[in-house]
């Protein structure tokens, strides 16, 4: 089985498809273990973020697609148009580019590297990685570090978190006059909340499934921040001007009815809602309501493109470095795959040498001259070593040009 990757991202699939194929963080360890023990793959890493779901495997790409469809209980033909399947070399290049932020919605964004490390850690804990994927991701992390150190690809990038504040500022003139509600307390919400906190909003509230985690984030923010439970949302939603949500829930947390009731109490005051979750936390129908301004990760594209032109110059240098590293890695892997063949070839050569030497010793014992024995030995050794290649070439003829070219290369006859 060969190294391969199957996936979809923000470039190939809309949010409505991506959310159907996302893996919840809590379910991912079991999923990657299941995949690596299925008929589809022998090694597996699953990367699932708001912008991509990718399965890096040693396996059969068609069976991996089938597994993905079955896991999410979807018809295979519904998802196939949005998927890409990559061969060994394409998989290596793709992994390097993703880790370097070259394939991200935000060119050069650093968060993806941490997400890949989390995915690899989960696979390692489930013993779902073997020699091939371990080698791939060790090199991936090394290349990502080198690209980010030696190029300016990540400089001045507008992150999804900072873009959230920019978007709110397009609707409200002063963040300092606003009440801001964060739904969830994970990494994305922590990043977004940090940017909002720098603008000193009037009030910040973190709603989470557990109060302790919400309080922990409030303590980090160190401003007017207070915790609450998700169950409090229907009663408090109307008090907030800005709502940012990013949880791991597989079902919407905020429905159209809840927002309708909040808007009535707000008396035509606008409600800015940013849903950064995949699957979505806020029902899409909320966007149809007057005075509700609902944005999703796909709506952030234009905002995060700010400064992209300057970063694209750095990206060109990064792409060159990635290409060099891909070629280097592929050569190393092909060299390792050739080790058993090289050993077998040398064993055959040694076997031929011993046979010819044994015959030569017998000839010397019978009184043949050294000159005669050496002449016969050299002819026999030449015949033995070239018999198989010559026979194979005669059978192949001119039709198998790849074989003819390979033999010419091996014996340096193509000069």
UniProtKB/Swiss-Prot annotation:
Active site: 50
Keyword Nucleotide-binding: no
Annotated substrate binding sites: 49-52, 104, 109-111, 115
Keywords: NADP, Oxidoreductase, Porphyrin biosynthesis
Residues where NADP(+) binds: 184-189
Keyword Signal: no
Xref: SUPFAM superfamilies: Glutamyl tRNA-reductase catalytic, N-terminal domain (SSF69742), Glutamyl tRNA-reductase dimerization domain (SSF69075), NAD(P)-binding Rossmann-fold domains (SSF51735)
Catalytic activities: (S)-4-amino-5-oxopentanoate + tRNA(Glu) + NADP(+) = L-glutamyl-tRNA(Glu) + NADPH + H(+)
Superkingdom field: Bacteria
Site positions (Important for activity): 94
Pfam families listed in its UniProt record: GlutR_dimer, GlutR_N, Shikimate_DH
GO biological process, one term: protoporphyrinogen IX biosynthetic process from glutamate
Assembly: Homodimer.
Miscellaneous remark of the record: During catalysis, the active site Cys acts as a nucleophile attacking the alpha-carbonyl group of tRNA-bound glutamate with the formation of a thioester intermediate between enzyme and glutamate, and the concomitant release of tRNA(Glu). The thioester intermediate is finally reduced by direct hydride transfer from NADPH, to form the product GSA.
Family designation: Belongs to the glutamyl-tRNA reductase family.
Domain notes: Possesses an unusual extended V-shaped dimeric structure with each monomer consisting of three distinct domains arranged along a curved 'spinal' alpha-helix. The N-terminal catalytic domain specifically recognizes the glutamate moiety of the substrate. The second domain is the NADPH-binding domain, and the third C-terminal domain is responsible for dimerization.
NCBIfam families in UniProt: hemA
The protein's name in its UniProt record: Glutamyl-tRNA reductase
Organism from which the protein derives: Neisseria gonorrhoeae (strain ATCC 700825 / FA 1090)
């Amino acid at each position: 089985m060969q190294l391969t990757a199957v996936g979809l991202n923000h470039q190939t699939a809309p949010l409505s498809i991506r959310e159907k194929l996302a893996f919840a963080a809590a379910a991912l360890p079991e999923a990657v273990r299941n995949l690596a023990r299925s008929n589809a793959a022998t090694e597996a890493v699953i990367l699932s973020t708001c912008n991509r779901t990718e399965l890096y495997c040693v396996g059969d790409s068609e069976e991996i697609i089938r597994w993905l469809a079955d896991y999410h209980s979807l018809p295979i033909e519904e998802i196939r148009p949005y998927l890409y399947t990559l061969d060994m070399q394409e998989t290596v290049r793709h992994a390097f580019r993703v880790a370097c932020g070259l394939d991200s919605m935000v060119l050069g964004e650093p968060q993806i590297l941490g997400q890949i490390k989390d995915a690899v850690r989960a696979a390692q804990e489930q013993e779902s990685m073997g020699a091939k994927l371990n080698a791939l991701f060790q090199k991936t992390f090394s290349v990502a570090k080198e690209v980010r150190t030696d190029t300016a690809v990540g400089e001045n990038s507008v992150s999804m978190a900072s873009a959230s504040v920019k978007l709110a500022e397009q609707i409200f003139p002063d963040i300092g006059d606003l009440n801001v509600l964060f739904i969830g307390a994970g990494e994305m919400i922590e990043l977004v909340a940090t940017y909002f906190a720098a603008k000193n909003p009037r009030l910040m509230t973190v709603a989470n499934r557990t109060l302790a985690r919400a309080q922990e984030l409030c303590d980090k923010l160190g401003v007017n921040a207070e915790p609450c439970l998700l169950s409090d949302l229907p009663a408090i939603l109307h008090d907030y001007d800005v709502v940012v949500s990013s949880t791991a829930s597989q079902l919407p947390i905020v429905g159209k009815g809840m927002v309708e009731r909040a808007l009535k109490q707000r008396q035509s005051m606008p409600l800015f809602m940013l849903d950064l979750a995949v699957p979505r936390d806020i029902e899409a129908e909320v966007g149809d309501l007057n005075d509700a301004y609902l944005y999703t990760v796909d709506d952030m594209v234009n905002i995060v493109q700010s400064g992209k032109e300057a970063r694209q110059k750095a990206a060109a240098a990064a792409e060159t470095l990635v290409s060099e590293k891909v070629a280097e890695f592929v050569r190393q892997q092909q060299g390792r795959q050739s080790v058993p063949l090289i050993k077998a070839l040398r064993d055959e050569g040694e076997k031929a040498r011993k046979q010819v030497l044994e015959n030569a010793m017998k000839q010397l014992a019978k009184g043949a001259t050294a000159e005669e024995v050496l002449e016969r030995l050299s002819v026999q050794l030449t015949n033995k070593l070239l018999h198989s290649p010559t026979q194979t070439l005669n059978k192949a003829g001119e039709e198998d040009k790849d074989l003819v070219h390979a033999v010419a290369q091996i014996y340096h006859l193509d000069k």
